[in-house]
Structures are given as structure tokens and as C-alpha cells.
Amino acid sequence: MEMAFEQELILVLDFGSQYNQLITRRIREMGVYSELHDHEISIEEIKKMNPKGIILSGGPNSVYEEGSFTVDPEIFNLGVPVMGICYGMQLMTKLLGGSVERANEREYGKAVIKAETHSLFTKLPEEQTVWMSHSDKVINLPEGFNVIAHSPSCKYAAIENPERNLYGVQFHPEVRHSEYGNDLLRNFIREICKCTGEWTMENFIEIEIEKIREKVGDRKVICAMSGGVDSSVVAVLIHKAIGDQLTCIFVDHGLLRKGEGDMVMKQFGEGFNMNIIRVDAKERFMSKLAGVSDPEQKRKIIGNEFVYLFDEEAAKLKDADFLAQGTLYTDIIESGTKTAQTIKSHHNVGGLPEDMQFELIEPVNTLFKDEVRALGIELGIPEHLVWRQPFPGPGLGIRVLGEITEEKLEIVRESDAILREVIAEEGLERDIWQYFTVLPDIRSVGVMGDYRTYDYTVGVRAVTSIDGMTSDFARIDWEVLQKVSSRIVNEVDHVNRVVYDITSKPPSTIEWE
């Protein structure tokens, strides 16, 4: 099973493009496993991975600049199909003897190309719209390369060396603005790399179970359960692999949603017969967070306290060597890599103290959110649990903006419960990717009855998305929003105003902190 899995790998090398994980995502949608790795990966490591094909991502650098990202040229001699996208195509050109220089004008946005209807463009229209995003251009092709697509402003929109199975495109096929981008990627993966497209959650489970058993042996694992979908799926997966060697520690840090703690104990402790220890740490977390308003500092404090608490619990349990987390692919990219600026430290990535005594197990850190949900269904977790709203590790701590107090937490907890109730009543749970309330650290004047009020404003955030990498605000019917607003103002103490966030990602993130 492991060998078959490795043979069906498409390796994506990261040169810093904002779209690099979308490449991986699109490939997986075709039933082929794909991983994103740093461009500095060695040839020996690549050989061990035995990929069926390699994609060089785009990136913000210019290939002729000193210190720009590069790759070992030996990658083109492995006998494996390689496709470069934008910067990846320019890098391939330069390393193989062609030339690249700055374009007179930066090309950004939609463009119409004219393509040869073979190779990457097999069974595709001769003319098609693509998404360009580049400020450099190829001037001369390396020996053995041909032009297979061009546009009025881009002489080399796509190139190939069929004898060596090397390809390049000066646009982004992974972006949905490229109308036949998925088809082009499919041609590369299926026709050129000869992948069969048999990657499923079923074989992912088999492989991960074997990995977990091999890594853990007869030792013990502690799983950090936050009450969210990610950690719950991880707990069930690891329990399936090693059974009673797993102990889940559910930290009730006082930052949970309404009814969260009891639900976790009932559904997973009783429902899946898992060993779960519930730790009441409300006072501990609140004392550490007292007076803290900076969001990064709050994340670090919450992350550190989690792990310090696990150290203490592990000492009681004895022989716990591993800490399991529900880290996702998107968590890693948003916490920054060698090629990406840190957007915000993630609770499962940037909040861990350096002296942590555990080895990490992160079995879903190569999956996107919708893949984790599919994994949960395959593991037998009921749909109503799998489709629960995503909940960050720091919990309501990052949905109360500024300093955290018990009063503010109660406002967010109650308003969020109302929002979820209304969305469920309207049958919109599956139509909206994520929805929650936040409490900005502002008050405003209002009138309730015959009296002037000066109370808090609650923000409602609801977005649509496919994989969490990008999102747009949900177009919820005004009558539904009015119902949400009316109930929150009338049922939640100290609130006199409700606002709706109509910002997409980017430029914003989904969470406010």
C-alpha cells in the first residue's frame, strides 16, 4: 500500500507563490496525492519520495536577481516530468540555458492565449482565457524547447521539451480565472505523468494508521482536544490506530463555545469509547491572560499554557511521549515558511515552547479543511459533528478583541450560540463555510426603551470558501441577518449594536485576530 501511494505522488516545489497550495489542492481534487515542499529539497530526498511528476510553483522573485530562489538543476535529469508555473517556468528556462529579463510592463489579470491543441493543451480550445501575474518574461528558449502557446503580449505563454518531458506555462492554471486551468493540470498529471488518480480518504487512513503505529510503537500519545473538528478527527484517527495507548486531554480553558465541554465528553468519551480527561483550567488561563490585549501575545500565552498543562498531565499519566495536534496545511502556510511572510502565528504552529518535552504527531497537516471533513466521515464520525463550525485552538480568546474578561466571553458565547441557532433554523449550515461572532473592543451609544445605553457592538462574520485559503463574505438574506441582530440585542446583556463583516480574504483573514 505504501509503495503504491508513493508512486502516485506529485511533488510541488514552493518558490513563494500565494497560489502554491492551490496547486496542491487542485491536484488532489483529481484523486492524485500531492505534497508541497521547500525549493531547497535535495535531489536525494526527491529520489526517495519517488514522485510521478514535479511542479515548480510561481513566486515573487526575479530569476536574475542575486539571492533569488533556485533549485538543483539535476531535477531536470531525473527522468520525471517537470512543469514550471510562472517563476517556475522562468527558472527552468534560465537553468537550462535560456534567457529571462524584465518585461516592459507587468502583466497581471486575465489574458487570452492561443495554444497548440496537443501536449498540455490536448482536447482544449485553441483560444482560452488564463490568469497572468508576472513582471519578467522569457526572451530566448533553451535548446530543445518549443512554443505551444502565446498571447499578444507574451510570446512564450507556454513551452515544452517533449523529449525530456519538461513543460512551462507563464500563467496560473491553478487559479479559477484560468478557464481551462484544471484541464491543463489534468493533462499534465494524467496524460504526461501517467497518474491513475486513485488517492482517496480510505487509503489515506490506511497509510496514516501505519505511520502512526510505526512511529509510536508501544508508547503512549496525548491528544489535545479543543472541541473543534480538526482535533476531534485527529483523536478518532489515532484512536483507530493505537486504541488505549491514546489519552485525550480536553482542556476546558474557559474560552469554549456554549455547551462545548459537555458535548465533547458525551460524543467522544461515551460515543467512541475514548479515554478523555477533562481539565478545568479556567482560572489558570484567565489569570495568565489578565491585562493582555495584543493578539499575538494572547495566542502565545494560550499555546504555551496548553503545552505546560500537558506536561503536568503527562507526569501524572507517565510514559506519554507524543502530543497529537489537529494542524492543517493552511495553518502551516499562514504561519510563514522560508518563502512566505508570517500572516499570524498559528496556535498549532507558532505557540509551542522550545522546551516542550513531547514529540509531535500531526496526521492531518497535509490536508485542507474540506479533506479533514471527508476524513471524519470516512472514520465514522456523525455528519453533524464533522460539519460543526471550525473552532480555533485559542477559542473565544481570539474572538474577544483586546483584553479578555468573563463578561466579554459571555457576550461572545451567547451571541455565537444565537447565530448558530438561526443559521441552523434557516438550513444554511452547508451553504456557509464558517460563521461566528466577535466582540470588538468598542462601545457605542444606543437607546433601549426610554433609556440611553452605552454598550458593546457584536460583529457577525460569515464566509463562503472551498479550502480556507481564500474566502468571500456570505450573501445572507437580510431578513436572516435581521433575525440574528434582533435576537442578539434582545437576548444578550450589554449589547446594543450588531454589525456584519463584508470583507473577503484577502485582504482580511477569516478570524479577526
From Swiss-Prot:
Enzyme Commission numbers on file: 6.3.5.2
All copies of domain Glutamine amidotransferase type-1, residue ranges: 9-198
PROSITE patterns given in the database record: GATASE_TYPE_1, GMPS_ATP_PPASE
Recorded metabolic or biological pathway in which this protein acts: Purine metabolism; GMP biosynthesis; GMP from XMP (L-Gln route): step 1/1
Domain (GMPS ATP-PPase): residue spans on this chain: 199-388
Enzymatic reactions: XMP + L-glutamine + ATP + H2O = GMP + L-glutamate + AMP + diphosphate + 2 H(+)
Signal peptide stretch: none
Pfam families xref list: GATase (PF00117), GMP_synt_C (PF00958), NAD_synthase (PF02540)
A single MF term (Gene Ontology): GMP synthase activity
Binding positions (ATP): 226-232
Database matches in PANTHER family: GMP SYNTHASE [GLUTAMINE-HYDROLYZING], GMP SYNTHASE-RELATED
Its biological purpose: Catalyzes the synthesis of GMP from XMP.
Record-given protein name: GMP synthase [glutamine-hydrolyzing]
